[in-house]
């Protein structure tokens, strides 16, 4: 496996992250998963460092007997910074309560892990339905390297009524 277009990370580090060694059976779906989809995928290395526009394309360059040569062509793109962090759906919960749990602030580099951590911490508050929580990059401007991040929240009903009484004979 050869890497082209990578300037941020050396090929050796990308190979370690890929976890596919020379001599392993060729499996294109596993290769694509290890580049883009797995939790510790090569692409996540870039997404955690602001490279929202990262793209990797594996291409078979040579097939000989029982061997396949692959070239992974990388387009790193430019780093993206968060322009605005938008919070929607918090009708009862004060916005500063939500913002203090966020690991994503305007001006920060786009960071996939920080977004996931923010989502976990918002869910742990107990005020929002984690199943309906949505976090989406919007207003993506590749030429300026900017993106807005939209947190769409649905508050859980937490109204409680407690009644107690007593009876005594006197």
Regions found by a protein language model. Name each.
Residues 1-169:
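Periplasmic polypeptide-binding modules associated with outer-membrane biogenesis and secretion
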């Amino acid at each position: 496996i050869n890497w082209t277009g990578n300037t941020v990370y050396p090929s050796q580090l990308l190979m370690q992250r890929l976890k596919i060694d020379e001599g392993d059976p060729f499996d294109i779906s596993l290769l694509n998963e290890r580049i883009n989809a797995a939790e510790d995928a090569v692409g996540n290395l870039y997404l955690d460092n602001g490279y929202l526009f990262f793209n990797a394309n594996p291409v078979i360059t040579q097939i000989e007997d029982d061997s396949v040569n692959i070239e992974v062509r990388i387009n790193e793109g430019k780093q993206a910074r968060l322009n605005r962090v938008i919070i929607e759906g918090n009708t009862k919960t004060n916005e500063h309560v939500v913002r203090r749990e966020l690991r994503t602030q305007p001006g920060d580099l786009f960071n996939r892990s920080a977004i996931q951590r923010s989502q976990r911490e918002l869910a742990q508050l107990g005020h929002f339905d984690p199943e309906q929580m949505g976090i989406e990059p919007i207003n993506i401007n590749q030429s300026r390297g900017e993106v807005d991040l939209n947190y769409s929240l649905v508050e859980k009903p937490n109204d409680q009524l407690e009644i107690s009484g007593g009876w005594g004979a006197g």
